[in-house]
């Protein structure tokens, strides 16, 4: 997920950024290797889709009164078979955070989706930690940070146009999912 807020640039993990001597002088510094793996436009397209998870989908609890996060963020919930693992990965322009709830023994798992899905098990961890991050002014991460739309971005660059009133289309099977989901908020 780090390639999305970095607009398609992959940074190789780097454990040590510099080495100082006893006097505090930097004797060596290191920068991560980086390469473009996705165009800015495609990265922003993913950002836009993953923002919808927060604004309209399984991550929308972050917008509710419990967490009340109004920042420009994207994210993705995830649940493995038999509710053994719940995931939430969220990101803002300056930080990506992954939360996992699960265990090594695959036979031990939540009994139902009500508790075992990523939106119920891992997202609350993200919500609480994200509030603390925003409250800590020393980190340089604020709720006012926003994603920049690339100047060359076009949401319909494939030549396909959305259907008129596409947002109003709801299939009958979707209503049951939304009602069940709302019952937990």
Segments (PLM) and residue ranges:
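A penicillin-recognizing enzyme superfamily signal
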Residues: 1-172, 177-178, 183
